[in-house]
Amino acid sequence: MSTSGTFFADNSQTIGKTPLVRLNRIVKGAPATVLAKIEGRNPAYSVKCRIGAAMIWDAEQRGLLGPGKELIEPTSGNTGIALAFVAAARGIPLTLTMPETMSLERRKLLAAYGAKLVLTEGVKGMTGAVRRAEDIAASDPDRYVLLQQFRNPANPAIHEQTTGPEIWEDTGGAIDILVSGVGTGGTITGVSRYIKQTQGKPILSVAVEPEASPVISQQRSGLPLKPGPHKIQGIGAGFIPENLDLSLVDQVERVSNEEAIAYARRLAQEEGLISGISCGAAVAAAVRLAQQSEHAGKTIVVVLPDSGERYLSTALFDGIFNEQGLAVV
């Protein structure tokens, strides 16, 4: 990232430096400290801004982008929005494939940034979106550049270079437990590499996945992978991403749809943090750990991937809006 004087060269350069905020009321006097990394403060309001910028910068540096080239990528929403804001800032055409079950706000944001959106069957999840993107790229390989967020090494690398050092600096190296939902695997892999390998601190790295689609747990147990539908947008892709380094994952916590929604609502109402469903899942796991006696006195850092505004049309806010007599937008 670079600046000219006191201003940034373009909006993609403004990623990172997100705040770390202590959770208070939601933790209910647990013996551990829980700190939330608020990734919704990134320029397009999610943790994926980091990888969106990093993957495009990397493609530019490797000479993959230029006249006549277009980006193509599968997304559950946040990566697509991140790529869209960077592509707009740098003048690159972008096509995105996304399951039709993702929130309406995400689709509107993508259109607002000028991206072309191709919807895929919701029942096929991210696997269907990935296959559709691969088919489009293969149909005209001289035109399309597929960034492949699930296997692109620039993804975990940007977290190793930025997110990890930010957490380390802001905690003064006092982090004991990292809690992160797993979508592409880039966040937990990159942050864990930095803290465990670069700083040499043996933290407990905890992956969070949907209870209804526990493929990481199945993989670690040597069981056949049996993904299932769930409502926690942004995590639980239904397969093991290449960017997820399981050797760095010490524990897996499974969270139900209901827990994720309940904790996302509590974050807004008890901590003043309007948060997405995957944030609720991560915090549900973090609070669970914080309440365990073996973690007394420890510092838990939980990554909150995005902001809640892009979920206003989902089940996350249904009950609240109905109680207030408000129509879901």
Swiss-Prot record:
Biological process per Gene Ontology, one example term: cysteine biosynthetic process from serine
Enzymatic reactions: O-acetyl-L-serine + hydrogen sulfide = L-cysteine + acetate
Native species: Synechococcus elongatus (strain ATCC 33912 / PCC 7942 / FACHB-805) (Anacystis nidulans R2)
Binding-site residues for pyridoxal 5'-phosphate, renumbered to this chain: N78, G183, T184, G185, G186, T187, S278
Pfam families the UniProt entry points to: PALP
Family to which the UniProt record says this protein belongs: Belongs to the cysteine synthase/cystathionine beta-synthase family.
Needed cofactors: pyridoxal 5'-phosphate
NCBIfam families documented for this protein: cysK, cysKM, PRK10717.1
Keyword entries, A-Z: Amino-acid biosynthesis, Cysteine biosynthesis, Plasmid, Pyridoxal phosphate, Transferase
PANTHER family: CYSTATHIONINE BETA-SYNTHASE
Induction context: Transcriptionally induced in the absence of sulfur, requires CysR for transcription. Part of the srpG-srpH-srpI operon.
Positions of post-translational N6-(pyridoxal phosphate)lysine modification: K48
Gene: srpG
The keyword Amino-acid biosynthesis belongs to this UniProt entry's keyword annotation: yes
Gene3D superfamilies listed in its UniProt record: 3.40.50.1100
Gene Ontology molecular function terms on file: cysteine synthase activity
Top-level division of the source organism's lineage: Bacteria
Function comment: Catalyzes the conversion of O-acetylserine (OAS) to cysteine through the elimination of acetate and addition of hydrogen sulfide.
Assembly and oligomerization: Homodimer.
Record EC number: 2.5.1.47
InterPro entries reported in the protein's UniProt record: Cys_synth (IPR005856), Cys_Synth/Cystath_Beta-Synth (IPR050214), CysK (IPR005859), P-phosphate_BS (IPR001216), TrpB-like_PALP (IPR001926), TrpB-like_PALP_sf (IPR036052)
RNA-binding listed as a keyword: no
Protein name stated in the entry: Cysteine synthase
Pathway of action: Amino-acid biosynthesis; L-cysteine biosynthesis; L-cysteine from L-serine: step 2/2
